[in-house]
Amino acid sequence: MSMPATAADGTDAILRLRDERKKHPEIISVEFPGSTKWREAYDAIYSHGAIIENPYLALRIYMNESQAVDVYLKQNPGLECRNTAFYSTPEAVAAGQGTAVLKVGKSIVAGSFRGFNGREAVDIADVESRGQAVTNDSTVTVTDRGWLYNGHRIDVCERYTAHANSAVIDVEILLRGVKEGDIFCTGVQKLETDNRGGFTLPATAYSSGKNAPDGKKPEIVEAGALCVECDPANLADTGETDLNYLLLLKPDKDGYIRYTITASRPQ
């Protein structure tokens, strides 16, 4: 296992098991059979999924069929999530700590990878196995083996890479078993209030606005500006739904899709 990162290192990647004794041991990788109930896998991981972090933001990728990419924004540059694990208190935020800023729900959030059924994004639901791993202090991988999509099985490997001097997270998707006509998607959510968003050339989806990340605490409102940009060679089309601005994606001849995720507080 790699050594814990420090603020000077500029990136960190964290995967922990949830522990009833609240030790939450760090692990290198985990994989669940496809038959595992989503809530069991989701709750088995502390923070509900792997975390990847640069000095400006952090992402966590949920360990379930949505594989939602949630966003944590910093008030001050540095690494925080080894301590906060996405669970910031109002008092800590008032003192300058970062916090999760999005209400995930059923949206694509910010750069989640999904299928597309011609109308909307679809989860990676029927799989033979699902896993996450920390490759090093700057890389997290997510794997779905044997995803049943459009009547055939696909193997998916998602790689998320952070950089010490950038707020951008690079995403590389490798697909094996894709057939002609298979279309996938990513994009950004529409925020609950004051939402502004859409698409810019050549291949970018963006949005900004406000929402209450925790439905149990509607009085705590956060603001976020989201941007996902894909390789123009991977862009098949764009689409807008009630929840999302979507980039519709096709893999290249080698099975790759590439895009970037970034977020900030609106100016």
Regions found by a protein language model. Name each.
Residues 132-137, 163-165, 175-182, 250-256:
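A short, structured loop/turn motif at beta-sheet edges
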Residues 156, 167-199:
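Acidic (Asp/Glu-rich), glycine- and aromatic
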Residues 144-148, 162-166, 175-179, 190-192, ...:
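Beta-strand elements of well-folded, non-transmembrane domains
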Residues 94-165:
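Extended, loop-rich substrate-binding clefts of extracytoplasmic carbohydrate-active enzymes
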Residues 139-141, 157-159, 170-172, 185, ...:
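Beta-strand secondary-structure signal
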Residues 224-267:
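Beta-strand-rich recognition/accessory modules
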Residues 3-124:
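Solvent-exposed N-terminal domain segments of exported/luminal and surface proteins
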